[in-house]
């Protein structure tokens, strides 16, 4: 299929030539997210708007370039061009996903892209016909379920012994306007999403149906798809207005080696609604609301992916899954426990360049998501492994007990040796293993064991502490997540309050709502908002931070406590060592006094051996089971290998067939270029008609030549049959002749009875030959040229046969029209020669009949001669002249022998000519076969030419009907859409007038409101500042008054002090010891009062200055009294603007009513027109499909006609080679054809037979006339 290409001076790319998708089997081992880009073909609407201009260029099967300014190159896991079929895409993306589900991984696949980019076609496709093999447009979801249940069936067959059981449950939901709807139960609406530890994220009360095969799953899919919200927009006639999620829960249970396994996985197939722009889609009313919700959820999806990338880079800690129902439901698929495939659908058209770039960027971000996929499997009842573990533990306990006992014995013996008791020394000499050196070594080993035990205890405690800390952190994190969700909910509530407030203000502005009701609702909303803020305050982020710090401090305290406890643990460890030493001494003493320790040791060894044997037996059983499982796996692998090899062979054959078909299609396209383009269709039709006429003319001519050749071949076949009969007659004649010779020899020895019979036969032959010769005008003594030429031709016939075979094998020249004319002339000549040959054959048959007649007459005459001879002999017996008669009889016998010799020579020549004639018959057989083949091919060509002509006429008639249907369609379309266009134009005109007035009024209103708010703010600021200034003035005045009072009091005190000092100075100084301290205290008091007075004066001065400044400010504020006037004027202007807006709204309402009435009047007639228009569209589509089918049939017939023409040319070349090779090339001989040779041979045969007959007749006459 040729690729569409378009050139663009501004970066328009061209269509790629097509890249083969390659599956990587090891991809899912290292990755959990796969991103696939799928490019859809250009639509007819895009071609009509932008032509073949493209905005993307594919570089390989993993890279694509956006050809805008500047160019951007993107690399993904797979890039599928517009030529990739649904089957190929499923093999590289759908099959691995099913395999992951069967292995126990959660899997998810969703399609992303703008509206009309092919998401629903990719995910669902044509689901009306189910999962039939011939349905090439079947999407991912049906193919996934078909492959899934095939895998389940194979797993059941392979693992029959494990009692494998599968259970599949399907559910189908859609998210429409942020509400979850159950597509399998339309009565269930507005379902809720729940999350718990057991089920994870799930939808409450969602319908689940258990399915057992692909047909039942498809039935659920079709039933749910029929309930899905779909509407038409400017960009897509069947645009999905919701997100759909088809979920399949797969559970499997089996038993293996005493273990009950339970594996489960979840498969999500998501079809997202397309992002769209209001300008491009023309969404209004309900469609606009749907588009808003769709874009909101898709933007949340992009935000979630961005935050996931940030989390993987340790730059963020929060992912807003709960901001939309879609992301909350797909929480596990995005950054969770799942293997996810994202198929980003894009349009290559230049008119969708911005949307395509946005989709490519989204897919590039999605490549960096990191999921943590694990196998969901549980196991229970592992009895055998538990028994093995028990045996291991028993053996380990026995070994440790033995070590402990030996250490205790050594410690006891060592202590006894130190005490130097005689019994102990004697026992040590007998054992020879409890020396002081060995004691030190075992003591060191014991310390090592103790240290290892202590370390194990410590690790166990640390693990328990960490586990508790993690559990506490998890609980805190869950609480924090709950708090964060509540915060988000409160913020949304506040946002909703604000939106409602804005709407009410708009209603108050437009006069639809009174001020009192507005204030009441405002008060209620404010109360609710205050409650929400209080709740938010209770869940303050600072509280969260403090809680986390509290946990951190608790962890630090635990670590410190661990360090403190280690000292106590060391003390306890020392105590345990001391106790162990004492225990060892006691055991050593007990061991020394036991009578038969060896028997106990042997019994202990026997028990340990029995336990070890039991352990070995269990281990052997385990090994046998493992070997059996490995054998099963090996057989399964071998079967899989054989299946893969068979599949590879099948694919190789399919590839070869595809290549062959591709080459044939290219050859046909080079010979007959019948393009579907309507602009070039008339020229292509003219060329095709000319070619068909030329082929028909050539075929007719060849047919005439073939008919001539076929007639000649039939005549040759009849001649060959007659020649065969003649040869048989000749053989019978030769046998009769030989029998006559044998009888003659016998009679020569014993008498003369056979002579009359031989003479009769000769007479019959000579009469037959003579008659034949006379009939052909040939005298007995004449020898025609053919008698001398034919022997040479007999030798050259073998050379001619070899030339024929060489010509059939080596002749490679093309058969031209001139050669066809020459062959036709040669065939005409051979036909004439064949007629001559048939005449000769009829003459030969007449001669044979005459020969038979004369043969019977001769036999009768010989009978009478016999009787005469008997009478003569009887007379001669009695006569004395016996000797003379005997002499005459001997001379007659010698003459008869000579005649027989000549007849034998003639018959031998006849036999040779018959052999040559048989070669000619074989040649005629070859000619007949070649001509028959040519006749069949000619008849087939004529039949195909007639069919081709008939199909061409049908296609022309269909095209005429198509043009008529298109004209009627255009007429109905113009008639149907003209009222819409008129209403639309009227709407645009009135909307422009009213809209401009409304926009100007609204802009002016906003400006006035801003000025009014600014002036009101200034007024409030001035009033607040004035109030503060007056308050400060009052405070300063009161302060000044207080300072003046204090100053007066200080003045009075100062005067009193001066008076006292003056009085003291006037007192008698007779008592100086008492007056000095009093004077000093008064003076210091006076100084202090003076200082305080100075301070008061400075403070008073400062307060007065501040008072002057405040008074100046108050005076300056009093100058802004004109603000109230400005505010009043602006309020009046705002009221005028509101009235203007109301007028514009009324005009808009009147305009809408007018348009509605006009539309209702026009809509009455549009229903009938719509039915006619749809019927006309259906007819046009039907005619186009028929024309396409006719064109395909014409192409197929043209290819068949070319093949038959080539075969016919080859057959004609073979026939021409036969004719040319049989024509002699010797210039000395006459240019004779094969029929001439046969004629000459027959003439020679007739001559020889005539001569033989003549000889026999002469002999007979001599005998009859003695």
Swiss-Prot record:
UniProt keyword Nucleotide-binding present: yes
Any Pfam family hit: Kinesin
Keyword annotations: ATP-binding, Coiled coil, Microtubule, Motor protein, Nucleotide-binding
One biological process term in Gene Ontology: spindle assembly
Signal peptide: none
Coiled coil regions in record: 613-668, 817-854, 1029-1060, 1084-1120
Annotated ranges, domain Kinesin motor: 32-369
GO CC annotations, alphabetized: microtubule; spindle
Record carries keyword Nucleotide-binding: yes
Positions of the UniProt region annotated as Disordered: 1-22
Gene3D superfamilies named in the record: Kinesin motor domain
Residues that bind ATP: 113-120
GO molecular function: ATP binding; microtubule binding; microtubule motor activity
Family the UniProt entry places it in: Belongs to the TRAFAC class myosin-kinesin ATPase superfamily. Kinesin family. KIN-12 subfamily.
Record-given protein name: Kinesin-like protein KIN-12G
Organism from which the protein derives: Oryza sativa subsp. japonica (Rice)
């Amino acid at each position: 299929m040729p690729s569409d290409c378009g050139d663009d001076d501004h970066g328009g790319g061209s269509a790629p030539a097509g890249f083969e998708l390659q599956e990587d089997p090891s991809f899912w081992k290292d990755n959990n997210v796969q991103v696939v880009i799928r490019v859809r073909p250009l639509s007819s609407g895009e071609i009509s708007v932008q032509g073949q201009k493209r905005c993307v260029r594919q570089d390989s099967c993993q890279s694509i370039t956006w050809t805008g300014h500047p160019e951007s190159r993107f690399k993904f896991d797979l890039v599928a061009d517009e030529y990739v079929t649904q089957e190929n895409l499923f093999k590289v993306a759908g099959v691995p996903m099913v395999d992951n589900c069967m292995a126990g991984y959660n899997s998810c696949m969703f399609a992303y892209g703008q509206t009309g980019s092919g998401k629903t076609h990719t995910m669902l496709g044509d689901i009306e016909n189910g999962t039939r093999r011939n349905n090439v447009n079947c999407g991912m979801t049906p193919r996934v379920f078909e492959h899934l249940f095939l895998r389940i069936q194979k797993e059941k067959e392979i693992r029959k012994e494990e009692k494998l059981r599968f259970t599949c449950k399907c559910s189908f939901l859609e998210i429409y306007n942020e509400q979850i709807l159950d597509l399998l139960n339309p009565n269930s609406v507005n379902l809720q999403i729940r999350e718990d530890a057991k089920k994870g994220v799930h939808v409450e009360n969602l319908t689940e149906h258990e399915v057992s095969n692909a047909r039942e799953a498809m039935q659920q899919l079709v039933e749910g798809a029929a309930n899905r919200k779909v509407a038409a927009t400017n960009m897509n006639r069947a645009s999905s207005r919701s997100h759909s999620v088809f979920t399949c829960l797969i559970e499997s249970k089996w038993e293996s080696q005493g273990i009950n396994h339970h594996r489960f996985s979840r498969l999500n197939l998501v079809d997202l609604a397309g992002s769209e722009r209001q300008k491009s889609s023309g969404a209004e009313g309900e469609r606009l609301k749907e588009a808003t919700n769709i874009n909101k959820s898709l933007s949340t999806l992009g935000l979630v992916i961005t935050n996931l990338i940030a989390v993987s880079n340790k730059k963020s800690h929060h992912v807003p899954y709960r901001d939309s129902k879609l992301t909350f439901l797909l929480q596990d698929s995005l950054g969770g426990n799942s293997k996810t495939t994202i198929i980003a659908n894009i349009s290559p058209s230049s008119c969708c360049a911005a949307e395509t770039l946005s989709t490519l960027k989204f897919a590039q971000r999605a490549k960096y998501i990191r999921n943590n996929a694990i196998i969901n499997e549980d196991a229970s009842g592992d009895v055998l492994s538990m028994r093995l573990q028990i045996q291991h533990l028993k053996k380990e306990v026995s070994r440790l007990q033995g070590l402990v006992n030996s250490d205790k014995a050594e410690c006891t013996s060592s202590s006894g040796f130190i005490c130097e008791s005689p019994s102990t020394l004697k026992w040590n000499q007998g054992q020879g293993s409890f020396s002081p050196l060995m004691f030190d070594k075992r003591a060191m080993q014991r310390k090592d064991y103790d240290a290892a035990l202590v370390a194990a205890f410590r690790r166990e405690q640390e693990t328990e502490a960490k586990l508790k800390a993690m559990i506490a952190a998890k609980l805190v994190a869950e609480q924090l997540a709950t708090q964060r969700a509540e915060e988000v909910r409160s913020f949304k509530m506040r946002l909703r309050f604000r939106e409602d407030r804005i709407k009410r203000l708009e209603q108050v502005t437009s006069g639809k709502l009174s001020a009192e009701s507005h204030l009441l609702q405002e008060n209620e909303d404010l109360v609710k908002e205050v409650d929400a803020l209080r709740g938010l305050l209770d869940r303050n982020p600072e509280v969260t931070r403090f809680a986390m710090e509290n946990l951190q401090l608790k962890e630090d305290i635990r670590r410190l406590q661990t360090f403190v406890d280690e000292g106590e643990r060391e003390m306890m460890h020392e105590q345990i060592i001391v106790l162990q030493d004492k225990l060892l001494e006691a055991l050593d003493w007990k061991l020394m006094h036991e009578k038969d320790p060896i028997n106990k040791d042997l019994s202990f060894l026997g028990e340990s051996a029995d336990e070890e044997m039991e352990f070995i037996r269990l281990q052997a059983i385990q090994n046998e089971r493992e070997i059996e499982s490995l054998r099963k796996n090996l057989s399964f692998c071998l079967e899989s290998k054989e299946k893969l090899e068979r599949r590879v062979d099948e694919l190789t054959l399919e590839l070869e067939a595809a290549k062959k078909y591709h080459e044939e299609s290219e050859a046909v396209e080079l010979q007959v270029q019948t393009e579907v383009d309507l602009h070039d269709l008339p020229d292509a039709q003219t060329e095709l008609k000319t070619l068909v006429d030329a082929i028909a003319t050539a075929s007719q001519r060849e047919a005439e030549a073939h008919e001539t050749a076929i007639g000649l071949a039939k005549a040759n076949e009849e001649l060959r049959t007659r020649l065969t009969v003649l040869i048989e007659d000749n053989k019978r004649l030769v046998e009769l002749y030989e029998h006559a010779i044998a009888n003659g020899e016998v009679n020569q020895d014993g008498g003369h009875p056979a002579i009359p019979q031989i003479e009769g036969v000769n007479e019959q032959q000579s009469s037959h030959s003579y008659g034949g010769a006379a009939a052909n005008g040939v005298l007995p003594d004449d020898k025609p040229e053919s008698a001398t030429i034919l022997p040479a031709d007999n030798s050259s016939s073998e050379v001619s046969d070899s030339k024929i075979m060489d010509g059939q094998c080596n002749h490679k020249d093309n058969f031209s029209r001139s050669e066809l004319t020459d062959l036709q002339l040669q065939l005409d000549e051979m036909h004439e020669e064949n007629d001559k040959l048939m005449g000769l054959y009829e003459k030969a048959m007449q001669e044979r009949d005459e020969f038979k007649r004369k043969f019977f007459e001769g036999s009768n005459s010989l009978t009478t001669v016999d009787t005469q001879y008997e009478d003569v002999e009887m007379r001669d017996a009695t006569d004395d002249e016996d000797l003379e008669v005997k002499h005459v009889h001997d001379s007659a016998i010698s003459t008869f022998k000579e005649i027989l010799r000549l007849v034998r020579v003639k018959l031998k020549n006849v036999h040779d000519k018959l052999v040559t004639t048989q070669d000619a018959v074989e040649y005629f057989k070859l000619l007949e076969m070649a001509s028959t083949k040519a006749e069949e091919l000619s008849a087939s060509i004529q039949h195909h030419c007639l069919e081709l002509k008939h199909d061409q006429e049908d296609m022309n008639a269909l095209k005429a009907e198509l043009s008529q249907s298109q004209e009627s369609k255009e007429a109905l379309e113009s008639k149907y859409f003209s009222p819409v266009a008129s209403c639309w134009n009227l709407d645009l005109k009135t909307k422009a007038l009213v809209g401009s007035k409304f926009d100007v009024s609204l802009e002016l209103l906003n400006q006035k409101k801003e000025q009014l708010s600014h002036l009101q703010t200034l007024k409030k600021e001035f009033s607040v500042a004035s109030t503060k200034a007056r308050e400060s003035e009052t405070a300063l005045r009161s302060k000044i008054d207080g300072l003046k009072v204090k100053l007066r009091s200080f003045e009075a005190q100062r005067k009193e002090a001066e008076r006292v000092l003056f009085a003291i100075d006037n007192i008698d100084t007779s008592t100086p010891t008492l007056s000095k301290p009093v004077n000093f205290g008064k003076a210091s008091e006076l100084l202090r009062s003076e200082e305080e007075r100075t301070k008061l004066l400075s403070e008073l001065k400062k307060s007065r200055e501040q008072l002057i400044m405040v008074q100046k400010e108050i005076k300056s504020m009093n100058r802004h009294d004109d603000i109230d006037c400005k505010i009043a004027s602006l309020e009046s202007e705002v009221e005028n603007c509101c009235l203007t807006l109301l007028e514009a709204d009324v005009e808009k309402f009147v305009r809408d009513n007018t348009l509605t009435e006009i539309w209702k009047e026009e809509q009455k007639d549009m229903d009938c027109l719509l039915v006619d228009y749809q019927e006309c569209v259906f007819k046009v589509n039907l005619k186009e499909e028929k024309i396409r089918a006719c064109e395909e049939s014409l192409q197929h017939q043209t290819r068949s006609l070319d093949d038959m023409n080539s075969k016919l040319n080859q057959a004609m070349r073979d026939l021409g080679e036969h004719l040319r090779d049989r024509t002699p090339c010797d210039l000395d001989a006459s240019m004779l054809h094969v029929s001439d040779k046969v004629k000459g041979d027959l003439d020679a045969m007739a001559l020889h037979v005539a001569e033989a007959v003549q000889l026999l007749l002469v002999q007979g006459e001599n005998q009859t006339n003695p």
